[in-house]
């Protein structure tokens, strides 16, 4: 028995091999188990590692990474493919994500849809095409955009530029010309997107469009957020305008973005990641209808656009640039209709083409218009350039003015509300001699 005890204490234990695959640990042999036990090699090494050979490697210090590091871009998402949001879903622990169904967990649009709907691209050079940009307008817009991309010491630059003025004065088109001149592709919004059947949706859309513009700036290209007719979507036009919660949230969102332009978060996501500053340009007709704290000087810089005579002549030269109209005739045309908007002259030019369209309809027949325009193998019709004389332009201009006066003078809505029958609705046409019947 003593022999058996002594043999049990002689069990051989192979030391662990830290080198891995060159040698392997063997099954311990024992006299007690018998001398016929075969030794086999195991593919697994002992996981117990000696503390004397343990090597600890520190993590990489990101502060020591320089801008010259060729692999630096791997740590940042530089793709503009919105489907990256969907592909990355589930890669991050839920602790660091916002609640489901909010934020950017789900792709809002594909990249092509962003380009086709939100992103406005320009493929023309306004200097070559002869478009006129008013110097005062260009100065105000260029200075505002440039200031917002600069870091000025001890100075708070207003984020929003509000351009307002009369209807049809070319505010939006002048902005687009300046954007094209500066090679900026702005993210566009309109007043129709500032209201929704869902409460809070327009405010969320403003933040999404702002962050989309910030992503473009982060990738090294200038961008801006351009909102058309802000007062029509967020203002109060008389006592009959219904003031909804979306109007309130749109005003509050723009105020919050103007106060914190580099920390614009989506609803439900509150990480402290800064975004580039994006200048916001808005247009409108009457900013007195907006919420007063939004248009205060620290948040919005206001610019009243009233084109001078020289501006109107310059814009009209651009409108009639392909019609071979002499500059003297354009000056006479502008001076003949001094109270009209710039858009009036564009409508006047379109009215001249009515004669050519009327000739084409007479040639093909009224019953064949659909076949020729919608389902035709011949392609769209082409017209010769109509000759525009000053006499014809003045004639059509007076016709447009007369139509404007009729709208202001003959207010049939008041007659319909005050009388059950048609009443004197045709009296104006009878008095002017244009009523036949």
From Swiss-Prot:
Molecular-function annotations in GO: ATP binding; ATP hydrolysis activity; ribulose-1,5-bisphosphate carboxylase/oxygenase activator activity
Gene3D superfamilies in UniProt: 1.10.8.1070, P-loop containing nucleotide triphosphate hydrolases (3.40.50.300)
Record's compositionally biased regions (Polar residues): 1-10
Keyword line: ATP-binding, Chloroplast, Nucleotide-binding, Plastid, Transit peptide
This protein's record includes keyword ATP-binding: yes
Keyword Plastid: yes
Locations listed in the record: Plastid, Chloroplast stroma
Annotated ATP binding sites: 165-172
InterPro entries: ATPase_AAA_core, P-loop_NTPase, RCA-like, RuBisCO_activase_AAA_helical
Predominant place of localization: plastid
Domain of life: Eukaryota
GO cellular component annotations of the record: chloroplast stroma; thylakoid
Region entry Disordered, spans: 1-26
Family: Belongs to the RuBisCO activase family.
Function: Activation of RuBisCO (ribulose-1,5-bisphosphate carboxylase/oxygenase; EC 4.1.1.39) involves the ATP-dependent carboxylation of the epsilon-amino group of lysine leading to a carbamate structure.
Protein name per Swiss-Prot or TrEMBL: Ribulose bisphosphate carboxylase/oxygenase activase, chloroplastic
């Amino acid at each position: 028995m003593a022999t058996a005890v002594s043999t049990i204490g002689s069990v051989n234990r192979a030391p662990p091999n830290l080198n891995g695959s060159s040698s392997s640990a063997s099954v311990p042999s024992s006299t007690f188990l018998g001398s016929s036990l075969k030794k086999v090699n195991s593919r697994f090494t002992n996981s117990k590692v000696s503390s004397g050979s343990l090597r600890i490697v520190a993590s990489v210090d990101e502060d020591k990474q320089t801008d010259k590091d060729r692999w630096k871009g791997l740590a940042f998402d530089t793709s503009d493919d919105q489907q990256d949001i969907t592909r990355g879903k589930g890669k991050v622990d839920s602790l660091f994500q916002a609640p489901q169904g909010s934020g950017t967990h789900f792709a809002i649009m594909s990249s092509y849809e962003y380009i086709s709907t939100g992103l406005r691209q320009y493929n023309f050079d306004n200097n070559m095409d002869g478009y006129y940009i008013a110097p005062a307008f260009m100065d105000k817009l260029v200075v505002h955009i440039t200031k917002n991309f600069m870091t000025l010491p001890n100075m708070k630059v207003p984020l929003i530029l509000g351009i307002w003025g009369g209807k049809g004065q070319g505010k939006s088109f002048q902005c687009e010309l300046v954007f094209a001149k500066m090679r900026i592709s702005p993210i566009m919004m309109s007043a129709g997107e500032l209201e929704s059947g869902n409460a809070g949706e327009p405010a969320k859309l403003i933040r999404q469009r702002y962050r989309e513009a910030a992503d473009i700036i982060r990738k090294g290209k200038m961008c801006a957020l351009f909102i058309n007719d802000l007062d029509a979507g967020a203002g109060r036009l008389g006592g009959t305008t219904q003031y909804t919660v979306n109007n309130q949230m749109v005003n509050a969102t723009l105020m919050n973005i103007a106060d914190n332009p580099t920390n614009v978060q989506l609803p439900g996501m509150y990480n402290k990641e800064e975004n580039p500053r994006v200048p916001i340009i808005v247009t409108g007709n009457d900013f007195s209808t907006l919420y007063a704290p939004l248009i205060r000087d620290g948040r919005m810089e206001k610019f009243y656009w009233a084109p001078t005579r020289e501006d109107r002549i310059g814009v009209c030269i651009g409108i009639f640039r392909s019609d071979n109209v002499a500059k003297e005739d354009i000056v006479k045309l502008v001076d003949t209709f001094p109270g009209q908007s710039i858009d009036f002259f564009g409508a006047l030019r379109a009215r001249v083409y009515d004669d050519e369209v009327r000739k084409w309809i007479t040639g093909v027949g009224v019953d064949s218009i659909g076949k020729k325009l919608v389902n035709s193998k011949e392609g769209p019709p082409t017209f010769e350039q109509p000759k525009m004389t000053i006499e014809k332009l003045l004639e059509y201009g007076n016709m447009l003015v007369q139509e404007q006066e009729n709208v202001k003078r003959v207010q049939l809505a008041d007659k319909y509300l005050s009388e059950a029958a048609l009443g004197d609705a045709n009296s104006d046409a009878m008095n002017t001699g244009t009523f036949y019947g």
